[in-house]
Every structure is written in structure tokens, then in C-alpha cells.
Amino acid sequence: MEPGVRARSGAPQPASPVLWRARPAGGGGASSWLLLDGNSWLLCYGFLYLALYAQVSQSKPCERTGSCFSGRCVNSTCLCDPGWVGDQCQHCQGRFKLTEPSGYLTDGPINYKYKTKCTWLIEGYPNAVLRLRFNHFATECSWDHMYVYDGDSIYAPLVAVLSGLIVPEVRGNETVPEVVTTSGYALLHFFSDAAYNLTGFNIFYSINSCPNNCSGHGKCTTSVSVASQVYCECDKYWKGEACDIPYCKANCGSPDHGYCDLTGEKLCVCNDSWQGPDCSLNVPSTESYWILPNVKPFSPSVGRASHKAVLHGKFMWVIGGYTFNYSSFQMVLNYNLESSIWNVGAVSRGPLQRYGHSLALYQENIFMYGGRMETSDGNVTDELWVFNVRSQSWSTKTPTVLGHSQQYAVEGHSAHIMELDSRDVVMIVIFGYSAIYGYTSSIQEYHISSNTWLVPETKGAIVQGGYGHTSVYDEVTKSIYVHGGYKALPGNKYGLVDDLYKYEVNTRTWTILKESGFARYLHSAVLINGAMLIFGGNTHNDTSLSNGAKCFSADFLAYDIACDEWKTLPKPNLHRDVNRFGHSAVVINGSMYIFGGFSSVLLNDILVYKPPNCKAFRDEELCRNAGPGIKCVWNKNHCESWESGNTNNILRAKCPPKTAATDDRCYRYADCASCTANTNGCQWCDDKKCISASSNCSTSVRNYTKCHIRNEQICNKLTSCKSCSLNLNCQWDQRQQECQALPAHLCGEGWNHVGDACLRINSSRESYDNAKLYCYNLSGNLASLTTSKEVEFVLDEIQKFTQQKVSPWVGLRKINISYWGWEDMSPFTNTSLQWLPGEPNDSGFCAYLERAAVAGLKANPCTSMADGLVCEKPVVSPNQNARPCKKPCSLRTSCANCTSSGMECMWCSSTKRCVDSNAYIISFPYGQCLEWQTATCSPQNCSGLRTCGQCLEQPGCGWCNDPSNTGRGYCIEGSSRGPMKLAGVHNSDVVLDTSLCPKEKNYEWSFIQCPACQCNGHSTCINNNVCEQCKNLTTGRQCQECMPGYYGDPTNGGQCTACTCGGHANVCHLHTGKCFCTTKGIKGDQCQLCDSENRYVGNPLRGTCYYSLLIDYQFTFSLLQEDDRHHTAINFIANPEQSNKNLDISINASNNFNLNITWSVGSTGGTISGEETPIVSKTNIKEYRDSFSYEKFNFRSNPNITFYVYVSNFSWPIKIQIAFSQHNTIMDLVQFFVTFFSCFLSLLLVAAVVWKIKQTCWASRRREQLLRERQQMASRPFASVDVALEVGAEQTDFLRGPLEGAPKPIAIEPCAGNRAAVLTVFLCLPRGSSGAPPPGQSGLAIASALIDISQQKPSDNKDKTSGVRNRKHLSTRQGTCV
């Protein structure tokens, strides 16, 4: 037994008990014994595994506990057994061989690691039956797979591909999936990618044991006829190979309901009025049920997935499909639904095998379109084949593509044939995935009578097409209902959807219906009594974290067409799991028949669903509420099925009231048409937002016919560059990897954007020269129609002129006698446009388009008149990322070409196919790709692998060790028994050929582990695995690398070659030989160039390279990057600029260095030895300064004198500063004073300017302050006061009475606290004898004084206060000036 693999001796005997001893936790206590029968031994292994998992996952490092899962602890480090890796040897990574009669295998006690490749070979004896039980299996769905082969290599028949969560759903352990091989061998290969990892798997195996331990309903017995083989003796009322099928439950209700047939097929035979697997349901019944019919013959070769089935009479015709092995595959099968018998179609010639195609039946013919071909390249086809049921013969159709349509080669699509209201019979092909154009959202129509193909324009909602959806056609509503699929999602993402669309075939209108809430693809759909039944499918939609979604589903959903409602139906209540995807379903007599599919293995069973019968409902209320899964109507005192009624049944359907949609539900629709063409109750608001119809909106649209379709809405649905380029208004952004709409202003008003040009058609009658001038005035020229897009556009536009004849000039004229050319100087090729018969004639040298029965060119004199002209001008794309489309991934045939575009494509090395990254899952839905690459490419054949370790990493390779036993050998395709080769040139089968590694010549074949001695042919081994002495200039533990100073690939006897670096490097790249130059500024693979772009000069072939320094500048060199790691030297040169000044040098560095300085006057200095004269030689310094005298070195007589500085022997990283300078030692007084006064005057001028600015600012602020003060004073309260003046002895007359009392102030302004105030009075100034004031002076003045008012009497205060508050009051007393 191989190390690291757990096994136990002896096969389990189900009938014998097993004793297990359990000890309580803690150091003491009594022991207890648990007695288990043989049916529970797997359960014990599961507990043991979980206990081991918990112990290892919580274990401490090896230095503390010494725990290693598959290895031993040595010096606190785990030394792993072969095939195990990790700090605790907890991950598998290699090959294992198991030879025990039974045992188990696992990826490890914790989650498996990323990029894991593990292989197990279980070896029994020839033709032994080997059973695998997957008691635990959890991997990333559709990405991480376990492959099981019935043999000892991957070239043996494939029997199972496991992925996702394998969880039994029925009665626990007895339904654990079991895989069987019959060759005596089983090869299991596991591969995981780099997305996320799960808990892995725990697989039990046993040789010649009973299937599923007889499911607990039988006894495992040894066969009498064939020794060493066992079989199950089933208990009563159980049958099947594993005793897992119950029969005659409750004795079939005998005798009233039926009886049990114990001698024949062991099933219930019901009386006429009873039905069901146990005859417990009435005929007709108000309940539904599932059954598994007994199929005859039950051949495994029938199993397939992604096939298609149609019903013709009592036969279900099954065509195509995917299978593991096509050697015995039958393209056409039919199943008799009455007798449950399979028949193989007697077809001699026909199409190649394919899957993912579509089938549609019309009369006696079955139309098959598209699909993925099962050939070496695996291309998607656009072939249209017709199979005649009566003659059982194939014929092919080549339809004519109408107009400017495109026939898409698709897979994962669906098709239906119906008769339109126009009496035209048409096959409608819905969606699908095209390897060239990506996920298509188009409808394709094939008109059978005219044999024509068309891609029509559709109305209504803008829908998104995809792969693996299902669709049904309803005769009542004349519509096709499309559900689910794998699609392109917003934000350049891809995944499953739960969308439901309705396509009205006569009006070509899309409507979005209520989604199911359960995303899936590769499911089935049928229509029964007004309900669309959805079964199974792949529901895994996780991307970075597993949420428990299963790859294989048994979900059962029902959609009520009349009420737009979804219901979840109970899953099939059968004796085993029926999870699957990629199956087919048909309807006969109101029952659904499901066939085949994929659930880790290819299924060949048939499931039958019998829905309730409307006739069984006797009450009107029960009839109307029948369901889910069935639609009934009450008609004249009896209940009948939906299909038996007329089209008015929709109006009479009783549906639950629909709740108004919320705004959040409507927000998902980004365009007006999809917002209004759905059943969710939404409206399109004027601010380009979809909201609920119950929400307020100033201007809304509620009918899709009122919507304006914008280019952005169309372009966003195109998922590939090719499909984007087909739309003239879209362009592909290579950086964002999305299709974007071209702005409408690219060409301007009146112009049409067509391809890379703008075209404009004018119907005016002009000569050629005037037409050319007209276009010139519009910044264009007469159109050069060199592309098919431009020709098609012009021809279409000409047809729109119905009121007048338009035969426009185009930019084509005769250059010389025999040469016609376009205005853009391109030659006329007679491909996109052709001359009319008899043209060109000799009468004219200019061409125009003649709209005849067939539009074409006609020559005319350039001075004559033509009816119209076509102008053209270039268009400049605003998106700089828009470039021509790259080659589609599917057309790239090598790994290098496939992975050259970054992450756009993925290369599958096992199938030699390149696929789009966004379509990897649908390109390999059944795990056909064993390994993929997106960046680095590994050798595509075993022969390209040079070491045994690399060889055994690939599951299809083995290593042939040569007789030298030094590790040399060669890698070749093979199995555990020996190497293999192709059986023939045109035969893809491989056969064993031991002569490729002859054992008689002492060659050794290794398939599980490499030979112990792995010295690559450069040394012999001591102690079996230690290389004694590496020769041939090699080094390393296995002599796998070249010695320093040499390069090459010494693996498997390769040679090492000396590095060629011209003395400028000590080492080079070990594999490429590129030299790591030690002098900064020298570059090239062989250090043969100077880095002239960065001011390095010289010739490294004859000397070295120097950095040219400038005088009076300081340079800093930071050798800190990883590219500078090998640099240990840098050189400089400098030439004095002035002949009368000394040359100073200053250099310092962050690390110690050696310094050598030389000088030369010749032009060959630095290249010829002896031309330089040494000046300075220093070692191990960090700083140096010096000055070279111009007199000593005679700068004046040696104008070409050059100084060379060599800095060497420093360590990385380092920072170096160096400067050469020339200046006088005696200060020039004149220059000093000139400089001083210049600076002084400049400073003075700056000070003056600053002072002036300050003064200006101060004056401005002062003016503003005065203005504010005046405004404040002007806003103070004011009043008028009457003043009585005495002039001499005269009294004033205008007062009523004499003045009384003392003079009063004109104002009193109290201060805070009312203890002081400002008193204001009028004063009479001194006057002359005449009574008049002196000239130039005033006779009056206003005086103010601060007075104390705290001692005044209350009466006085009252009077004063009154006087202040009533300033307008006229005093009645005579006043006197004081």
C-alpha cells in the first residue's frame, strides 16, 4: 500500500457485525462497546473521518505536537509522504496507488488547496467489479472536477465526472452515489482551479462487493456460476441490482384496486378505475404522481445529455447529445412510450455527432439546427439537417439568407415550428451562444416553403439572450415562452438568470413576464393544460464563495400562463435522487416524460410525471382552484382542461389579485421599452427612470409603442466585438470589453454614420464636378464605396426615394485608359459594386449608380447630369479604446495565440481548444476540460516535458527512465501498464505499446512515482536518491541548474553554455543567457551596448560606458531598484569648459567604494589601453574632494582633455552624488559690488512697491471706514426743536406767551445704568454792538457735557425723561440761551 493512503484489509461483509469500542473523555472511566451491523460500517468510517478532520484542523504546529496528517515529524518539521504537501502534510498533490481490497481516499482533512492535481489508481485484478461510494463530496461546481476512468489511465473509458455538492436527499446513506468500473482498475483524477475551495471529498472503494450494500433491503451473496462475484438477494417487495426499488406497496390495494405481479416485472397491475405506482389513485385523479417505468432494453449506451427529443405519434425520437465515449454512440434513437422499448434508428449516413442543438417537428420531418460538433476543434455549426421519420434518412438544407441578415451558428438555443397567421410555416430559432458573436439576443427565422433565412427586427421589450434556456410554444396565445439560461449580465459579468419572456410570433413582440425566483440553465420545460412545467437544471451561481447551490437540481416549478404566476411543486417522491441537468422532456396524453441528462454520470433513465386530471374535479370552486401545475376551467357544469377550451379562456381565468409593483422592482429595467412591455406594472418617467405605475410622475410612458429606442439600449446587449461591429451605431471598447453606442454627433445633422465613414445622399441633379464641389463644401468628397456596409446602406436609402428617381454620382472615375479608381485613390475591385451589363462604355469617364432591376454602376460623361449624389467624409471615433476586433478565441489554434490577449481567452490543454473567458462553463458543461491556462502555456504533449516531476503532473503522461539510472529519460503518453500510442493516423484511440519503453533493455516505466535518482543525467546517486557529484557545469540538489557563469537547461541531460558578456558581467540568466551587466550604463543581452538614451557614451566592446557629466552641476545616482542589484561599478567623464580655471571634483556615496581617476588628451581615451594617465586611486572610501590645476594639466594647450572617474566595488543598494565645477579663488570686487548694488536696489524697489501698495490699501480702508461712520450717523434717530432767540431787547412775536422757566437742553442721551448722561444745549456766541456776529463766524454753537443725573429728584428725572422721549413737543416756556 502506498504511503499516506488509508486502507483496511478485507472487504466488508454486510451480514457480519462489527465491534467498536468507545472510551469516555478524560483519563479514566469505564469503556463501553458498541455493536454495529454491516450496513453501518460506512457510517463508522464517516465518524472516524470527522474526528480525524477535527483533530488535524485544530492541531498545533509540528514542533509542539508532532502531528502530521500524512508524514512524520522530524526536527519540528513535517516530512511528507509522497503525494502530500503542506506544513502538516494535509493536502494531496501527486499520484497514489491503492492495491488493498477496500479502503478510502481523501484530499486531506481540511479544504483542498488551490491549483490541486491529485490522481489515485485503484488496482484490482482483471475484470473485477470495483465500486466507489462518494460519502462526502464538495467542490466548486463546474470548475473543480473529479474524473473517474474505467481503467488505469485517462485514455480508458470515462464513467463519471463529479463536481459541486453531492448530497443524498432520500433516506440518507443508502442513496449515496456509487460509481462502478468493470475493468479491474479505476483511475481517479482531481483538478481544482484558483477561485475558491471547499471541503473536498471522502471516497470509499471496494472490489467485488454488492452494490450499495444491497441498500439495506437484501443480502450480499456469492455467485455460484462465477467465482469471486457477489450479488444481492433482495427482500420481499424490493427489486433492482441494489435492492433499491420498492414494488407492490400495500399489496397494490388488492383485490379492489389491483394485484401484485410477482412472477413478471414485479409491479402493480391496476384495475381500470385505479392508477398510480401502488394503485391508490382514482381514474381520473385529483392528485399527481411520479413513476419510473421499466425500460427494455436498459442499455448504458443510451445515456446522454444536451440531446433533444420530439414526439411523433407514440414514439419519442432522441437525436444527438453528449456522451463520454462515442465509439458505441447512436445518433438517432426512438422510445416507444406504450411498450417502453428503445430502438436504434437504422440510419446509414447523416450528420456528425453534436450536442446543444435544437429539434423541431413538422409533419414527417424533424429539423435539426446548430449545436457543437464533437470533432477535434469542437466548433459550433450552422448546419440545418432534416430527418424524415418515415424513411429514417437525413438530408441537409442550405437556406438563402435574405437581405442583410446574418445566420448565426449557435448552441444552447431552442426552436419551434408553427404556422403563422399569414399561412407561412416558419421555424423560429431562439437565442443561443455563438463562438464568433457571443451570446445572441436575436430571433432567427427559417421559412420552410421558400428555404430562406431571416433575422427579423423585433418590437417590445429589449431582451437579453443566452445559452441553455428552455422554451415552449402555446397555441392559445400564439406565443413562445422562454425561461432561464446562462447569460451576459450588466457590468461585464455572466451567470444564471430566472427571466421569463413571451414572444408573440405574429407581431414579433417581446414581453417580460414575472421571473421565477430560481435561476437555472440546461433544465427542461413542457406545456400541460395552460401551465409551463420546469424541471431540474444547473442552479449553481456562486462566484467567489459557496452558498450551497447545487450543480444538479430536481426542482419542480409551474408557471400559470393565464395568471402570470409561479408555483413550486413537490420534488419527485421516488426511491432515489433524480437531480440532473441537460435532460429532455416531452408531453404525451397529458403526461411528461423526462429522459437522460447528467448527474455526475450520464443518465439513461426515464421519469414520468402524471399531473391531476381536470375531469376529476366535480365542484366549480375546486375546478377553478386546481393546481398548482394544472389549469382548469368550468364549462357548463363540468370541469375541463385549459387546452380543450377556446382562446377566451384567458378572459374567464380566475386569477388572484396582483399587487402593484414597487419602485425597486421596476428599477431593474434600464430602458423605456422593457419598462413598459412587461407585466409588473411599471411606467417610464420623463427623467429616464422606470418606476411603479402607482408612483407619481409628471410625464410618463406606459405603452412600449410610445418609446424611443436609443442606441445605448441595443449596444449594451451585444456581448462580443464581432456582434457589436455588425451594428452601425455601436463600437467595441477593448479596454472595458463592452459594446458602447456611438454618439449621435459624430457625423453631424443630415449625415449617416456607416462603418468608419459618414455618408450623405442628395437627390439634386448635378454634374460630376458640381457634385464633387457640393461634397467639398460639406468637408467631404464623393463617396468611395469600398465596403459592403456602405454599398448596402446606399442601396437601401435609394429604395426609399419613391417620389423621384435617384441615380446618384459616386466617387468612381476613369484614371487612364484601362484603370478605374475611387476618389480616395483606392482601386476599383468590382467586388462590393459591379458594373451593369455592357458597362463601362467608352462614352464616359465618371460612374453613377443606376437603380434598375439589379442596382449597379454605369459610366457617363462627367459633364452630363445625374439624379443625385453620394457624399462621404471620415469619422473620428471619440473612443480611443475602440479598435478593430481581434481574432475570436474559438479561431485560435495554439495556446500562445489563445493566451496572448490577457484574460479574454482561456486555453484548454486537454481538448486543444480556445474559448472565451465568459463562456468557459458553457463550452465545457460536462467537465470536458481537464485543465486550463490563461497566462503561461505548458507543453501541449507529454514529449515536451523534460523532467519526471513535470511529467507526472500531467495525468496522461508517464516517465520512461533510461538504463543509466541518473535521472535521464523521456515523457510519453501512457498508463500504469506502460506507454501508449495512437492506434492509427485517422483513429483517435490509443493502445498499449511497451516497445516505446522496452523493459528488456533495462528501461524503467514510472507512472505513480518518479525513480529515486533524479540527477538529470549529470551524476550517479548514492543512497539511491543523493546526487554524488554534479558534472557538466551543473549544480543543485538534482543537478538541475547551471553553475554561475553558465546558462542553459541541464534538465534531462541538457548542456550548459558559458555566458558571453564581454567581461562586463560575471553571471547571466540561468536559462536565457542574458547577461547581468555589472557596470551601470551598459545594456544588451551580451552587454554590448551603451545606454545612449540616458547620456551614457562609449563602446563596451572595446572598453566601457561612461556617463557624460556637465560642469557646475551636481548629479545624483540612486541605484535602488531591483534592476540595479547586479551593478557594482559606474563610470563618468568630464571635459573642462574654461581653460583658465581649475577643475574641482566632489563625490560621496551612501556605501564604501573604490575610486580611480585618470585623464587623457587623445580621442581614443577610454577605449585603448595606455591612453589614460592615472591621477587618483582610493579604496574603501565614502567621500572624496580634489581640484585639478588648469596650469598643471595645461587646459589651454589641451582643449580635448578628458577626466575619467571609475567608481567600483560598491554594494547594492547605493546612492552616489558627484559634481565637477570651475570657479576663481580670488573674488572679483567689481562683480561683487555690481551684484551687491543690484540686489540692494532691487530690494529697495520691492520695498517701495510694497509701501505704496500698503498706503493704497490703508487709504481704501480709511475711506470705507468713514463711509460706514457717516452711514451709521445718518441712520441715528433725529427730531426738530424750536429755539427762541433774543436779539437785543426785542422779543419774538410768534410765541403765544412770554418765555417761562429756565432754558431747556435740546437733547439728553442717558448712559448705561442711567447714572450719567450727555447733555446738549444751544449757545449764543459773543456778538458785536450791532447784534450780529463777526464776519466769518457763527452766532450759534452746540455744546455737549457729561453730567451726573443720579442725584436729581424724581420729578426732575421725570421731566427730563419726558423731554427726551417727546422731542417733537414744543416748549410753552420761553427759553434763554446760557
UniProtKB/Swiss-Prot annotation:
Cystine residue pairs: C62-C78, C80-C89, C92-C118, C210-C220, C214-C232, C234-C243, C775-C871, C1013-C1021, C1015-C1027, C1030-C1039, C1042-C1056, C1059-C1068, C1061-C1075, C1077-C1087, C1090-C1105
Gene3D superfamilies in UniProt: Kelch-type beta propeller, Laminin, Mannose-Binding Protein A, subunit A, Spermadhesin, CUB domain
Name used for this protein in its record: Attractin-like protein 1
Protein's GO biological process: G protein-coupled receptor signaling pathway
Signal peptide from the UniProt entry: 1-51
Gene assigned in the entry: Atrnl1
Domain spans labelled EGF-like: 52-90, 206-244
Annotated function: May play a role in melanocortin signaling pathways that regulate energy homeostasis.
Transmembrane segments: 1230-1250
